[in-house]
Amino acid sequence: MLSQHTQARIEQLAATLGLYIYDIDFFKEDNRPILRVSITRKAPMQKQDCKNGLAVSLQDCQNVSELISPLLDVEDENLKDYNLEVSSPGLERVLKKPQHYIYSLGEKVSIKLMDKSVIEGILHDVNENVSISIDTGKEILSFSFADMKKIKVVFEL
């Protein structure tokens, strides 16, 4: 796990390139520690109208990797023998944090509920502490965060 200080420094460095940190995950895959940093050109709290033409490029990922790698090697003693991956959050990204929900307002989402049912609709509204609302095309439904097991953006052509 990264310290709050290190995460803040990563966010500052990405901002110098006009990029934002969407998420930072630390996990093991095939017994290898991986630090995955997801970046975007859009600030996490910006609304739907800021999406056009803001795709992350391979060059953006490389630039962020080159900026933060020395920082991680020096500042965070908890990281030893890890692999750094920098990428976009993807088209069908999982929404985990309140800012992810706000970032995805107006997009089609799939919600897997605790009872294992799945509902799709347009993410309509977010109350950061309590619930979200989606427009299914027939009605607007609200769900508490406690009722949701997983929510992700659904890519459509």
From Swiss-Prot:
The gene is rimP. Required for maturation of 30S ribosomal subunits. This is Ribosome maturation factor RimP. Belongs to the RimP family. GO terms for biological process: ribosomal small subunit assembly; translation. Its main location: cytoplasm. The keyword Transcription regulation does not apply. HAMAP family: RimP. Disulfide bonds: none annotated. GO terms for cellular component: cytosol. It is found in: Cytoplasm.
